[in-house]
């Protein structure tokens, strides 16, 4: 078996956390040991990291509907682990598959034409109620949606990097930037990375969301996963120069 197959909490060197500001974990659906027993090890891992005072961030991948990950009880897993997650920004396809499986199936996996601003707000509110501080959904050609907790106390864990007052009770959508798409591999990861980078630089929610969209857009201009990504200052300059956004609008 590969490393994904066997990776578990015992592989973690928790002494490294003293050097971390954000602990980011990707792809529980590809880490079968972590999601076994309704996410027992995943919960242990994230709660242990959070117990060290480190900001926790979680990203997903779309499970294989016919594999073990696709058959997992994702509502139960997420309800178990999300209280230990500070930042949670999955794609809309991933979260609908896991949290609203019947809708995913009714829509045949074609999620974007069926979502509205109201749908996203309700779904994000459900996630925030599970204990997450900052959540949102990567929307591909429709951009990025962001929503944060109304509880300033929940944001205290982020106070070393953000202005809590500016980040409390936020509800934002940013359209995608206009690009010639060459490939989408790594687009969501790039956008998430751009968001976390802006968070570490103390940016506002709007700026973090804007740059997240920009980094994702730069990524898709190349066919591979990384070569389109620019330095932060170059990305900012491109946005400030008036980079046009998509004409697609999010229905209310």
Where are these regions (language model features)?
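Hydrophobic residues in alpha-helical segments
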Residues: 99, 199-200, 219-220, 239
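Glycine-centered loop/turn positions within well-structured domains
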Residues: 142, 193, 218
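Short, small-residue alpha-helix embedded
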Residues: 96-97, 182-205, 209
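Short arginine-rich
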Residues: 218-227
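Ribokinase/PfkB-type carbohydrate-kinase core domain
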Residues: 1-177, 226, 230-252
């Amino acid at each position: 078996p590969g490393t994904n197959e066997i990776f578990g909490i015992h592989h973690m060197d928790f002494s490294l956390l003293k050097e971390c500001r954000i602990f980011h974990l990707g792809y529980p659906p590809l880490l079968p040991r972590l999601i076994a027993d309704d996410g027992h090890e995943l919960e242990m891992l994230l709660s242990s990291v959070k117990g060290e005072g480190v900001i926790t961030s979680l990203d997903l991948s779309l499970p294989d509907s016919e594999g073990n990950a696709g058959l997992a009880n994702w509502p139960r897993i997420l309800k178990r682990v999300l209280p230990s997650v500070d930042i949670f920004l999955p794609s809309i396809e991933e979260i609908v598959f896991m949290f609203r499986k019947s809708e995913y199936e009714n829509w045949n996996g074609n999620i974007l034409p069926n979502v509205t601003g109201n749908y996203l707000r309700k779904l994000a509110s459900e996630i925030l109620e599970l204990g997450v501080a900052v959540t949102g959904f990567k929307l591909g050609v429709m951009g990025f949606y962001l929503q944060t907790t109304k509880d300033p106390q929940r944001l205290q864990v982020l106070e070393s990097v953000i202005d809590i007052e500016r980040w409390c009770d936020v509800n934002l959508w940013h359209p995608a930037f206009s690009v010639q798409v060459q490939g989408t591999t790594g687009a969501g990861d790039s956008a998430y990375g751009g968001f976390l980078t802006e968070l570490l630089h103390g940016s506002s929610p709007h700026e973090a969301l804007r740059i997240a969209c920009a980094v994702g857009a730069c990524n898709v201009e190349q066919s591979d996963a990384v070569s389109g990504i620019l330095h932060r200052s170059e990305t900012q300059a491109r946005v400030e120069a008036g980079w046009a956004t998509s004409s697609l609008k999010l229905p209310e």
